[in-house]
From Swiss-Prot:
Gene Ontology BP terms: tRNA nucleoside ribose methylation
Originating species: Escherichia coli O6:K15:H31 (strain 536 / UPEC)
Reported function: Catalyzes the formation of 2'O-methylated cytidine (Cm32) or 2'O-methylated uridine (Um32) at position 32 in tRNA.
UniProt keyword annotations, A-Z: Cytoplasm, Methyltransferase, S-adenosyl-L-methionine, Transferase, tRNA processing
Location in or out of the cell: Cytoplasm
Protein name: tRNA (cytidine/uridine-2'-O-)-methyltransferase TrmJ
Binding site for S-adenosyl-L-methionine: T79, S80, A81, G114, I134, S141, S142, L143
Entry's Gene Ontology molecular function annotations: RNA binding; tRNA (cytidine(32)/uridine(32)-2'-O)-methyltransferase activity
UniProt cross-references to CDD domains, sorted A to Z: SpoU-like_TrmJ
SUPFAM superfamilies: alpha/beta knot
Known partners and oligomeric status: Homodimer.
Gene: trmJ
Enzyme Commission number, as recorded: 2.1.1.200
Family: Belongs to the class IV-like SAM-binding methyltransferase superfamily. RNA methyltransferase TrmH family.
C-alpha cells in the first residue's frame, strides 16, 4: 500500500533538501520519490543528508512536468500555506493521511510539495483534488521542505498502522474514481466545447474554467459519471455542428 504513495517535489533548488526529504520519507516507510524539473540534480550532499536513505534518492523518478508525476494517480493532494484567490477543498494532515492510505489500497496517490521559497503555483494547485495545510504556530509558521514532508508522512504512517491493527480499520475507498489523466482529458474536452458554443472566448476564458475545475474537484465524479459528462459534451458538439451546417 505505501509504495502506492508518491512524494512529489516540484522544482527543488537544494540537493540537501532532497536528501532530508528522503530521510523523512524512509523513517515513515515511504520510498516512492518523484522530482519534477529539479533545478539541481541529486549529488553527494543529497546522499549525505539522506543518512541511510540513499536508496530513496537513487530510485527517485526525475520527470520534466508535474503531469508526468501525476500520471496514473486517482488522488492528488497539494500542500499550500497561503490563502488563495480561488478557495479549494482543504484537508488537515490527519485527514490527508487517512484519505491517502484509503485510496492507495487500490491506485497510486500523489502528495505534492512545492518550491522552497514560493511553494506551488495556482495552476499546479488546481491539478489537485485537495489542498493540505499544516496548522503551525501562526507567529512562526515557517516549515522547511523536509519538515513539511515529515509531518505529512507521519500522518500517512499512522493511518497505515491503523489498518494493520485488529481493533481499528481504515475504510478503503473502493469507488472507481477516474485517474488524473482522465480528468485532464475531460477538462480539455469541456473547454473545447465551451469555446465552440461561444460560452467562453479563446484567449479570454476569464475564471470560468478555474471555477469549473473547482466545482468538479469538489464533486469528485466517479468514472461512470465522468463518462456520462463526456457523452453530454459529445452530444452538444454534435448538435452544434448540425446547427452550423444548416
Amino acid at each position: 500500500m505505501l509504495q502506492n504513495i508518491r512524494i512529489v517535489l516540484v522544482e527543488t533548488s537544494h540537493t540537501g533538501n532532497m536528501g532530508s526529504v528522503a530521510r523523512a520519507m524512509k523513517t515513515m516507510g515511504l520510498t516512492n520519490l518523484w522530482l519534477v524539473n529539479p533545478l539541481v540534480k541529486p549529488d553527494s550532499q543529497a546522499i549525505a543528508l539522506a543518512a541511510g536513505a540513499s536508496d530513496v534518492i537513487g530510485n527517485a523518478h526525475i520527470v520534466d512536468t508535474l503531469d508526468e508525476a501525476l500520471a496514473g494517480c486517482s488522488l492528488v493532494v497539494g500542500t499550500s500555506a497561503r490563502s488563495r484567490t480561488l478557495p479549494w477543498p482543504i484537508l488537515d494532515p490527519r485527514e490527508c493521511g487517512l484519505k491517502s492510505v484509503a485510496e492507495a489500497a487500490n491506485t497510486p496517490v500523489a502528495l505534492v510539495f512545492g518550491r522552497e521559497r514560493v511553494g506551488l503555483t495556482n495552476e499546479e494547485l488546481q491539478k489537485c483534488h485537495y489542498h493540505v495545510a499544516i496548522a503551525a504556530n501562526p507567529e512562526y509558521s515557517s516549515l522547511n521542505l523536509a519538515m513539511a514532508v515529515q509531518v505529512i508522512a507521519y500522518e500517512v504512517r499512522m493511518a497505515w498502522l491503523a489498518t494493520q491493527e485488529n481493533g481499528e480499520q481504515v475504510e478503503h475507498e473502493e469507488t472507481p474514481y477516474p485517474l488524473v489523466d482522465d480528468l485532464e482529458r475531460f477538462y480539455g474536452h469541456l473547454e473545447q466545447t465551451l469555446l465552440a458554443t461561444g460560452f467562453i472566448r479563446e484567449n479570454h476564458p476569464g475564471q470560468v474554467m478555474n471555477k469549473l475545475r473547482r466545482l468538479f474537484t469538489r464533486a469528485r465524479p466517479e468514472s461512470q459519471e465522468l463518462n456520462i459528462l463526456r457523452g453530454i459534451l459529445a452530444s452538444i458538439e454534435q448538435q452544434n455542428k448540425g446547427n452550423k451546417a444548416e
